[in-house]
């Protein structure tokens, strides 16, 4: 599908969530945070979240996009409102960069498979990557593409009219 004549440009800050239609381009910049994009190829609807942490300690009345669990529930709410099913969406996941690679005392992330392991982990980027994979699978989605982990930050651009997402990684400076 061609780029629409009038494009709505959305920039997500940490904790933001947006779900829209074919006239929308969503951008964000990620460090240790993670973004999940979802796109419905027939209806040309979809969205992106930019979460900061896997889950909230305690409870609240409203869903908060700063937390992965709640961001996924925001997606599920929009999917229900559109009378669609999770299996109809194409999912891509980005981010989880190690922003302080020199301080990483344990090397690369170990696989984290449950809430207890995720809670116990001290590396927020590893926690965010693990919870993304876990929640996406739990709710019946399949990840079509991902760009996760590594060092430093990245910019993500997601076009809802086409479902395409682009990632631009920043060159990381190393102090000597």
Regions picked out by a protein language model, each given a short descriptive name:
Residues 119-176:
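Divalent-metal-activated hydrolytic enzyme cores
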Residues 12, 26, 48, 143-147, ...:
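General beta-strand structural signal in soluble alpha/beta enzymes
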Residues 21-23, 32, 40, 126-127, ...:
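N-terminal intrinsically disordered, cationic/polar leader segments
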Residues 21, 40-44, 160-162:
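Short acidic-glycine loop/turn motifs at beta-strand connectors
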Residues 1-4, 9-28:
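Phosphate-centric recognition/catalysis
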Residues 104-125:
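A charged helix-plus-loop insertion that forms the helical arch/lid used to bind
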């Amino acid at each position: 599908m061609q780029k629409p004549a009038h494009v709505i440009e959305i920039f997500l800050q940490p904790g933001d969530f947006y779900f829209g239609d074919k006239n929308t381009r969503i951008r964000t910049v990620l460090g240790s945070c993670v973004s999940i994009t979802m796109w419905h190829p027939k209806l040309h609807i979809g969205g992106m979240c930019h979460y900061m942490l896997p889950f909230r300690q305690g409870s609240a009345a409203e869903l908060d996009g700063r937390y992965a669990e709640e961001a996924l529930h925001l997606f599920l709410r929009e999917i229900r409102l559109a009378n669609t099913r999770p299996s109809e969406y194409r999912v891509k996941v980005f981010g989880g960069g190690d922003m302080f690679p020199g301080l990483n005392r344990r090397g690369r992330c170990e696989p984290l498979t449950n809430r207890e392991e995720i809670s116990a982990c001290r590396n927020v980027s590893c926690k965010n990557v693990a919870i993304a994979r876990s929640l996406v699978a739990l709710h019946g989605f399949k990840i079509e593409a991902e760009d996760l982990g590594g060092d430093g930050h990245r910019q993500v651009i997601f076009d809802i009219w086409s479902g395409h997402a682009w990632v631009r990684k920043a060159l990381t400076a190393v102090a000597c």
